[in-house]
């Protein structure tokens, strides 16, 4: 079965305040939704991994030319249009099933329980290169 990564980005969503400004009960409902979805995917045998990530203010970009010391730049990165907020990896029968899970993820509750319509990027996991390459 193919694996897909469902990527959630810190992308402004029209009409939805950033989660840092949500009421505690709205944050709790959002997290509970994500955990329930993970549990549903575990029960169906489709869940591989999923994690929420620390905010962009804690991120670091690292570049290295192979000589000397790497260059480390601390976040946040206002010039970046999208920064990864979290992901799920699912092992599903088809891309259509991955899209179905992404749609459910997109409808996670936000302030007042309204679906936030967060864009979810769906990408097939291709696996590691084989020695024949």
Question: Could you describe each region identified by the protein language model?
Answer:
Residues 1-133:
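Conserved, structured core segments of small domains
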């Amino acid at each position: 079965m193919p694996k897909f990564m469902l990527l959630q980005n810190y992308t402004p969503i029209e009409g939805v305040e950033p989660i840092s400004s949500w009421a505690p009960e709205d944050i709790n409902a959002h997290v509970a939704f994500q955990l329930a979805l993970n549990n549903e995917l575990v029960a169906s045998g489709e869940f591989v991994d999923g994690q929420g990530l620390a905010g962009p203010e804690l991120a670091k970009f690292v570049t290295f030319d192979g000589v000397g010391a790497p260059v480390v730049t601390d976040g946040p990165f206002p010039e970046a249009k999208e920064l990864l907020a979290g992901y799920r990896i699912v092992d599903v029968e088809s891309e259509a099933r991955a899209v179905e899970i992404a749609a459910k993820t997109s409808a996670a509750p936000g302030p007042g329980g309204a679906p936030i319509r967060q864009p979810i990027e769906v990408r097939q996991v291709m696996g590691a290169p084989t020695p024949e390459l």
